[in-house]
Structures are given as C-alpha cells and as structure tokens.
Amino acid sequence: MAATRRILALQNGHCILVAHSYGGAVITEAGTDPSVAGLVYVAAHMPDAGENEADDGKRFPSDLSKSDAIKRTADGFTYFNPAQFHEYFAADLTAVQAAFMARSQILNAADNFKAVITTPAWRSKPSWMVVAARDRTINPDLEADRERWYAQRAHSHTVEVTGASHSVYVLHSKEVADVIESAARAVSK
C-alpha cells in the first residue's frame, strides 16, 4: 500500500490504477487517493470494507486453494511451487513461458493476504474488471464465481476473456490494454 501511495504522490494530475491478482486489494485501498480517477482489476481481488483476500478465498475456494501449490518460506513469504505454476497460474501459456514466469516470480508476504480493507475505492470511483474465464487461481467458475461476483457487487464494467488463465495479460494483452484504454477514455470525459 505504501509503495502505491508513494507513486501516487509523484503524479501530476489524475490517473488510473491497474492491478492483477492480489494487487486488486492494494488498489482497492490506495485508490481512495484524490488523484485516482478509476480502477482496473485484471483477474484481481476486489474486497469490500472489513474483508481481506484470505477470507474471500475461503468463501470462494479456487482450484489453487484446494491444492498444495502455494509454498511458504520460513520467514513468512509465499510463492508458487514452480512445478505447479503452469497448471494453476498460466495454463494457457506454453511450458517454456510458464517456466520462465515461475522462475521469475516475486515472493509475497503471507500477511498481505490478511490485510483488511477499510475504505474500498470502487465504492466511490468507476471500476473495470477483466475476468479470466479459465482462472484457477481466483475462481471465476459459476459455482464460486468470485471474479464475476466482485465485478457485479462493484457495478464494474466487465470484460470476460474466454479461455484465459490467471496470467490473462500475457496471451490476451490486447484485450487487457483495450480495457485500460477504455477506462482512461471514460474518466477523461
């Protein structure tokens, strides 16, 4: 959160925050900054006040949450088991692409998933959601429907990308860029 707020302080004028995955919680909280004109969630979490990603994950379990693919370091950081990265994070990519992403992943502090949202920006600002229809990390399926549920609750402009995995921004970069451009145009009117 602090890193995003530092960057916002450096901006000259309005901006749009874009986030993927757990970054959605970050822009949900940081997006209340007056310089933020809109929010774009790309296969991302979108918690409400009093919620956090860990609890939302229990309410809407994904294939990932039912697996042992997430590993934890002794000092409290989490990462994808590289052997399972392709299956759960990047199923629509080639094995070579997924292996590269697995080797270059950034570890995340496990406590980040427990950060409780106080004031969700999507309640007062326009938002867009890119739903990755074959996401196994954040469940978009009809039985759990988390990405779609988030978007409906926030009244987000929603674009669903058929066949896309959690790493929707790789193979479907044009669709993701189009949503970001659409958001920028909408808030600049």
Task: Show the residue positions of the predicted features.
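Flexible "cap/lid" loop of the alpha/beta hydrolase fold
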Residues: 32-82, 86, 109-113, 138, ...
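Conserved acidic catalytic loop of the alpha/beta-hydrolase fold
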Residues: 1-15
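Glycine-rich phosphate-binding loop signature in dinucleotide/nucleotide-binding domains
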Residues: 10-13, 183-188
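Catalytic His-Asp charge-relay segment
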Residues: 124-131, 158
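Gly/Ala-rich beta-loop-alpha elbow adjacent to hydrolase catalytic centers
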Residues: 18-23, 27
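Active-site nucleophile elbow and catalytic-triad environment of alpha/beta-hydrolase enzymes
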Residues: 103-121
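Conserved loop-alpha-helix segment in the C-terminal half of the alpha/beta-hydrolase fold
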Residues: 133-170, 182-183
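Conserved strand-to-loop "acid loop" that flanks and positions the catalytic carboxylate
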Residues: 39, 128-135
